[in-house]
């Protein structure tokens, strides 16, 4: 295997050969390089270009297939596939490849032009309207912004941000520049910045629907559902029959808890776009959240019947914990997984769905293989580094030493309303939330992002700054600022509450911010939902999360995260003695009554029988565990990880001494 610098040196030699049209010489060098660096996608891409110019079309397609196996969303590989098929006069395959290329990367002008030309040549000009509109928008954009779109599509976010900021300094009111910078901010987790940019964009250009839709999506991510719904209503009023606008409104209605309206609108869309797979899948999500599992299954299956490569629908079926795939469905999923043209995202969905399918069949080796593949796909797209979070946790402990905590015992907002349930995902937090929210004095909400958003705001300091100011900057905050942050949290979260005096925030990752919570909300209750490390970590590893939780994409990564979590919780116990109630999942399963009374006593609540029969709730539940918590206490999952123990040595080794706290 060559070093990266050696590969780059060969490519630097080859590029002038390509520009000079010396394709045979270039091909020879690139074939050798492809043997020495078989997974270098840029080298393979240049080889495929050479092969096309040499009319070695079959060889070019083989080379492009190699790229797509390594990187399924390599947009230029799909575009080059289109060029090859077009040279072979296979216009149908060419059209599909060009379409896939622009789905991944909207900046590929030649793929847009090629689609329009093919459709016109094959007497299908009625399908060119949207493509011509997209091309006109792209041609009208300043070249730097086209470059930004291209970099975003390649996940080169730092370069994209630098280029976009440089452009915006010269053109501060360019709406598309604002929209793209907001898109980068959203991907980097800077939701405050993204919201500000998009709010400004729609002020300058109220009729810019792309900016408004992006604004709605950011509002949803920040769980400002009321404003997101209002914006969706404004969008719909512009064109009530537009299925895209209807879909946005339906999704925001669902997020706001109005599932009847959402389902009604989804049905209206299906009258315009019969059996649209995306709409059917969203409809299935709404039905699932309402507890209508059978109807959800039907909706997901209809989506698959319409579009067999729709991986999200398959995974949505797998995520219905009480659902089992038929043999025919498993065969169909494997066939789609083997298809080269399928998107990276669909492949990921299919791998996790196949893992669940084979686990249900007790074929654990095969199940693990698919879980591992699914995580590998996610890992490729992730920039997560365990060392960065380890350092952040250590910084929390360094700032919140005993002296600092002693100086800040009387700070913050005195409201006792919040009950934080923290820990790792898949640790039983949904179970604890359902128990507590069944009490008459407690409102259940969801995983609220407000504390994470505050931490992110403190971390970034200036807008889109790359310098971290959290937690190191906390000692500089005044008592007034700390109180205001607490009051802001109470105010912002009120939209999710009913009339009960207490409410739950079950965002698991808030354990990282127990110090901050104690500074701004000293009377809040904090419950640490803990589960056996092997069970918790493997359950996270086999779960495909909608977003975030990047530490779950590898056994070593999730083991490191769990170990660091335990170490940080030990520190919080030391500096805030008695502040956090630890609830062990296995103990809740073994003795529900005792643990429920213990939890209620900690929260200062009288015992209510409804907390024991929590599974009778009619409330919408928005987590992967939603089917489980509608059943009496879920005992079968306590030792599921042992079915996979033969494959979990890397996890055991990473957890190290943490495992010694638990019986084997």
Model-predicted segments: where are they?
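Register position in tetratricopeptide repeats
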Residues: 19, 53, 87, 121, ...
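Structural marker of alpha-solenoid helical repeat scaffolds
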Residues: 36, 70, 104, 137-138, ...
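PAPS-dependent sulfotransferase catalytic domain
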Residues: 256, 290, 445, 449-479, ...
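PAPS-dependent sulfotransferase catalytic core
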Residues: 363-365, 369-485, 630, 634
């Amino acid at each position: 295997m060559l070093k990266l610098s050696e590969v780059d040196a060969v490519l630097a030699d080859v590029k002038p050969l390509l520009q000079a049209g010396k394709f045979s010489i270039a091909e020879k060098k690139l074939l050798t390089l492809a043997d020495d660096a078989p997974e270098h996608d840029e080298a393979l891409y240049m080889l495929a270009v050479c092969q096309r110019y040499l009319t070695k079309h079959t060889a070019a397609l083989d080379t492009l297939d190699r790229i797509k196996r390594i990187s399924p969303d390599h947009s230029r590989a799909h575009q080059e596939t289109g060029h090859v098929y077009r040279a072979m006069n296979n216009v149908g395959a060419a059209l599909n490849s060009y379409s896939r290329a622009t789905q991944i990367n909207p900046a590929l002008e030649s793929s847009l032009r090629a689609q329009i030309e093919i459709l016109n040549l094959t007497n299908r000009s009625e399908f060119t309207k949207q493509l011509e509109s997209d091309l006109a928008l792209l041609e009208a954009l300043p070249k730097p912004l086209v470059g930004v779109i291209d970099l975003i599509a390649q996940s080169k976010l730092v370069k994209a941000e630098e280029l976009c900021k440089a452009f915006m300094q010269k053109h501060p009111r360019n709406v598309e520049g604002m929209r793209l910078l907001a898109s980068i901010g959203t991907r980097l987790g800077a939701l405050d910045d993204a919201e500000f940019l998009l709010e400004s964009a729609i002020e300058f250009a109220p009729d810019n629907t792309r900016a408004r839709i992006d604004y709605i999506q950011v509002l949803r991510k920040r769980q400002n559902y009321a404003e997101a719904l209002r914006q969706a209503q404004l969008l719909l009023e512009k064109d009530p029959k537009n299925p895209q606008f209807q879909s946005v409104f339906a999704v925001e209605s669902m997020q706001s808890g109005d599932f009847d309206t959402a389902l009604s609108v989804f049905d209206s869309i299906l009258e315009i776009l019969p059996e649209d797979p995306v709409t059917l899948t969203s409809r299935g999500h709404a039905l699932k959240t309402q507890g209508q599992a059978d109807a959800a299954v039907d909706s997901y299956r209809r989506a698959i019947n319409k579009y067999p490569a729709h991986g999200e629908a398959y995974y949505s079926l797998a995520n219905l914990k009480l659902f089992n795939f038929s043999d025919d469905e498993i065969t169909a999923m494997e066939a789609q997984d083997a298809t080269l043209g399928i998107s990276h995202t669909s492949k990921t969905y299919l791998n996790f769905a196949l893992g669940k399918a084979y686990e249900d069949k007790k074929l654990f080796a095969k199940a693990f293989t698919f879980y591992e593949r699914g995580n590998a796909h996610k890992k490729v797209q992730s920039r997560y580094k365990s060392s960065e979070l380890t350092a952040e946790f250590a910084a929390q402990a360094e700032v919140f030493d005993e002296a600092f905590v002693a100086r800040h015992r009387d700070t913050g907002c005195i409201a006792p309303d919040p009950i934080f349930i923290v820990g790792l995902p898949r640790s039983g937090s949904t179970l604890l939330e359902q128990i507590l929210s069944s009490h008459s004095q407690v409102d259940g909400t969801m995983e609220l992002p407000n504390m994470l958003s505050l931490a992110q705001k403190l971390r970034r300091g200036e807008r889109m700054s790359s310098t971290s100011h959290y937690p190191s900057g906390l000692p500089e905050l005044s008592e007034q600022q700390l109180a205001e942050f607490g009051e802001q949290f109470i105010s912002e979260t009120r939209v999710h509450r009913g009339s009960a005096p207490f409410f739950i925030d079950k965002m698991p990752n808030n354990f990282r911010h127990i110090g901050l919570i104690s500074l701004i909300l000293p009377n809040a209750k904090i419950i640490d939902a803990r589960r056996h490390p092997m069970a918790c970590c493997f359950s996270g590893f086999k779960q495909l999360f909608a977003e975030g939780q990047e530490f779950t994409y590898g056994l070593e990564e999730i083991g490191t995260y769990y170990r660091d979590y335990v170490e940080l919780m030990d520190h919080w116990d030391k500096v805030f003695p008695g502040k956090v109630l630890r609830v062990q999942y296995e103990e809740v399963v073994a003795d529900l009554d005792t643990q429920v009374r213990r939890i209620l006593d900690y929260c200062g609540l009288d015992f209510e029988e409804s907390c024991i029969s929590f599974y009778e709730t009619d409330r919408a539940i928005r987590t992967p565990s939603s089917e489980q918590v509608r059943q009496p206490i879920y005992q079968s999952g306590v030792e599921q990880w042992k079915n996979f123990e033969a494959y979990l040595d890397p996890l055991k080794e990473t957890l190290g001494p943490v495992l010694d706290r638990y019986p084997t």
